[in-house]
Regions:
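Contiguous N-terminal and early-domain "leader" segments and peripheral loops that mark the onset or edge
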Residues: 90-159, 300-327, 332-339
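Long, compositionally biased intrinsically disordered regions
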Residues: 1-143, 412-535
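Acyl-donor binding region in acyl/amide transferases
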Residues: 137, 146, 155-158, 168-179, ...
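Sequence-level detector for tyrosine residue identity
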Residues: 48, 104, 115, 126, ...
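A conserved beta-strand-loop-helix scaffold within acyl/acetyltransferase catalytic domains
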Residues: 241-340, 349, 353-359, 492-503, ...
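Long, charge-rich alpha-helical interaction segments
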Residues: 393, 401-422
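Long, charge-dense tracts
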Residues: 111-255
Length: 535
């Protein structure tokens, strides 16, 4: 019987994460047979891309890798020759030479218009909450501001300002750049425009198939590792970060940005990356992890939002971040669709290892969305048990007791699955992995103490309260140089922290002083000084 493309694809999917001899042989046979089939310009192509990416990242031998990469090239060539209609049918698929249509932040679009691998232009203003006239009132030269009051729609305003169609996106971005010193004002008005752009790849580089980090060596799999000593891995000393040339760093940064842009997503640490904070660790089993913080004007009060991208044999396989405050971190993980069904637990533990050692974190907390709250996939996959198996426990004692009972059934009764109602109950509480002896303080607890302090001691007068706590802190710091705008902001935050946490000793005040000086300059030094202040 002659097998069709979809049947062969399903057969390949059934063996792609198996590494016995028979399965390895089957992968080769299915890939060779699929290579004789025409490339379908439909959702099956996207599904095939996912399987090929999994095989490239988890190949068992060189022959499988070569065949998978050859199929990626064949798909790319077919799509390059495809008609505009055929490509448009695959919009937002991330396949080579297919368009993407989405909204992005001003900052990322500023980067995109300089990226040489794509053409980019305005598609539409879709359900804008604020029109262009209102926004440009803040930026246009005073002689032209009168135009913004003449009831022009967005298209009409651009015409009266005589902006050529091909320059309209760069014009809008340039105007909003005038608000860079007021980033949150800029964000509000720019995001409210609901400006949709269309990205047309010039070559295969802007695609999920070829958005990868160059490799010196490839790790070939003999198995998908499920069982390992988690604690030993978390405590295994990290290697030194990889030294990158300016060119290498630019390449990796491009891969990181494109990995999310191809999904029509962004995270703040990727979009507002502080390049000085970037570190890349090359770890076991083909895993590399990049971590990075945010520019000073985008940083959060007291805590540090540190993003990551995890690579598997050079392919971006997971992204997310940690909100780090002292020994505590709120952790989130998102595994890109092609790489699910692989070594998810090992990948997560490698991430925890990096944050544990780079920042001294010994308490990781995960919010319920990750395992089902407002996330049906998290419920259907039983994601709660993924975290449970790696030591995470519900913060609510009642739920923890229920989990113990359910997990015992899972171990004792073959095929037992928790009901949907039970899994939804687990989403009523965060889960946490506690590696130290104490549960560390949260930023929310500091915030609540500050609110209570201002209310009780200053009758809610926040201006007065800030002046007093800053004055008290400065008096304890022996010498302090002229502070920048960002350092003054940090001084206010840390002064309130000192007041409500009763930080008075000379050594801790010295640490607080260093926090003020380093937060906008050195993510890692800031964290070390914060740990010292909270000790």
């Amino acid at each position: 019987m002659k097998l069709n493309f979809l049947h062969l694809l399903n057969q390949l999917k059934s063996v792609c994460n198996k590494f016995d001899g028979e399965s390895n042989d089957a992968k080769i046979i299915f890939l060779e047979t699929l290579s004789t089939k025409p490339v379908p310009f439909n959702k099956n192509t996207s599904e095939y891309l996912n399987v090929l990416l999994f095989l490239c990242a988890h190949s068992g031998n060189a022959e499988t890798l070569i065949l998978a990469e050859s199929e990626l090239k064949r798909i790319s060539l077919a799509l390059k020759k495809a008609s505009r209609k055929e490509k448009t049918q695959l919009v937002n698929s991330g396949l080579p030479f297919t368009p993407s249509l989405s909204t992005y932040t001003h900052e990322l679009l500023q980067w995109m218009i300089t990226y040489p691998k794509i053409n980019i232009g305005i598609d539409s203003f879709y359900k804008s909450e604020v029109d262009l006239s209102t926004s440009l009132t803040l930026t246009l030269p005073s002689l032209e501001k009168e135009y913004t009051g003449m009831s022009y729609n967005n298209k009409g305003l651009l015409q009266i300002l005589q902006v050529p169609k091909e320059s309209q996106l760069s014009f809008i971005l340039s105007e909003f750049s005038k608000l860079n010193d007021q980033p949150f004002v800029k964000d509000y008005f720019f995001n409210a425009l609901q400006l949709y752009v269309k990205l047309i790849p010039k070559d295969e580089a802007f695609s999920k198939a070829y958005n990868r980090m160059p490799l010196q060596g490839h790790f070939f799999h003999t198995e998908i590792i499920k069982q390992f000593d988690q604690l030993a891995l978390l405590n295994k000393k990290l290697p030194l970060p990889k030294k990158l040339s300016a060119h290498q760093f630019k390449d990796v940064q491009t891969v990181i940005k494109n990995s999310l842009a191809l999904l029509q997503r962004e995270t703040d640490p990727v979009t507002y990356m502080d390049e000085r904070s970037f570190k890349l660790y090359e770890l076991e089993r083909g895993i590399s992890i990049a971590i990075y913080g945010m520019k000073a004007e985008r940083q959060l009060p007291l805590e540090s939002y540190v993003g990551y991208t995890l690579f598997k044999n050079g392919y971006p396989a997971a992204y997310g971040g940690c909100w780090v405050f002292g020994k505590r971190a709120l952790f989130g993980i998102n595994i890109f669709e092609p790489y699910r069904g692989g070594e998810s637990g090992f990948m997560m533990c490698q991430l925890l290892r990096v944050y544990r050692q780079a920042f001294g974190v010994d308490y990781f907390e995960v919010e319920p969305y990750q395992y089902g709250q407002g996330n049906p996939e998290g419920i259907s996959s039983g994601a709660y048990w993924f975290y449970y198996r790696f030591g995470f426990r519900s913060l609510e004692p009642v739920l923890n007791k229920l989990a113990e009972s359910e997990f015992e059934k899972i171990k004792q009764i073959k095929g037992f699955r928790s009901t949907e109602d039970t899994l939804l109950r687990f989403t009523e509480s965060n889960v946490a992995l506690q590696l130290g002896k104490r549960v560390p303080l949260t930023v929310a607890e500091v915030r609540d103490k500050v609110t209570a302090y201002v209310s009780e001691k200053h009758a809610g007068n926040r201006v007065q309260a800030e002046k007093i706590v800053v004055k008290n802190t400065l008096e304890k710091i022996e010498k302090i140089k002229l502070l920048t705008k960002q350092q003054k902001k940090v001084l206010s935050e840390t002064a309130f922290m000192c007041e409500v946490l009763h930080i008075h000793s000379a050594s801790k005040i010295k640490a607080v002083h260093q926090m003020v000086l380093t937060k906008s300059e050195d993510l890692y030094a800031y964290q070390q000084h914060l740990l010292a202040a909270l000790k």
